[in-house]
Amino acid sequence: MTPKKITGKILFFSDIDETLVNTDKSLSEENRAALEEFLARGNIFVISTGRALSGACNLLKRLGLYGKENLLVSSSNGAIVYDTYREKELLRRPVPRELMIEAFDLAREYPIFIQTYTDTSVVAEQDCESLQRYLALQQLPVEFCSNIRDAKIDPPPKLLCLDFFHPEKITQFRAFFQEKMRGRLDCFQSNPYLLEIVLPGVNKGTSLRFIAEQAGIPIDHTVSAGDAENDLSMILAAGIGCAMKNADDALKVKANYVTEHDNNHAGVAEILNRFCL
């Protein structure tokens, strides 16, 4: 049964890549118009992404969305919640330094490429072709260190393993990592080439519940939209969890609604118009 339109104040969580924006990272006029009308009615719109905060904010500035009232960013899969209008952090749940070091040791042992973050850049021990592709996509700078133990950085929001050329290696390392860490760190894939590593309990769903509670919005007045495995927690947490037409099949079977249009044809506007406007 298709959910009904919500009346009253609404919290909307949307993934960015392959959800809100087109594959070329542009924002359709249909999505822009629906999003602006949604905000004009006093609702809260959250960009919920695996991207690091600086990368997410850079994209929002390019799209002309940064700094709008009631537009928040939940970055690094929920590790940081940031108000772009007030330019203020509302939540930060970083990976402890000792666990970061242990994760780097495991990746080095395997071996697989791993990186972490400061508030403004990627931090890595070595260069590789996958890293350069990632930096170009995310438009982020990189800082290199000989060993992460010597890096003078704060506990990071997340770690990331990546391999754009051998995705099967990501899947294999995931099983190895989960066995070694035994619940001390969580990991999941945002796409076949990326393995996100965060503190247990950090995910898009817990971020949705946190913001809903802070804003005094009941869960049945929350909507989420996504396409990939790291979106599943917010699909399940929201009152109306929506999977894009282009989403993974595993996400579609768990969603309350699957869009008729994909991310390149204003699927988020479809959700906003059907349930929120």
Residue spans of the language-model regions?
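Non-catalytic pre-domain segments flanking phosphatase-related domains
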Residues: 1-16, 33-40
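Mg2+-dependent phosphoryl-transfer enzymes with acidic/Ser/Thr/Gly-rich catalytic loops
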Residues: 2-11, 28, 196-277
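Active-site metal-binding loops of divalent metal-dependent hydrolases
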Residues: 16, 50-51, 226-228
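Conserved ATPase-coupling elements of RecA-like P-loop NTPase cores
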Residues: 23-27
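Short, structured coil segments at secondary-structure junctions
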Residues: 69, 77, 181-183, 237-238, ...
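Conserved acidic, metal-coordinating active-site core of Asp-based
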Residues: 106, 110-225
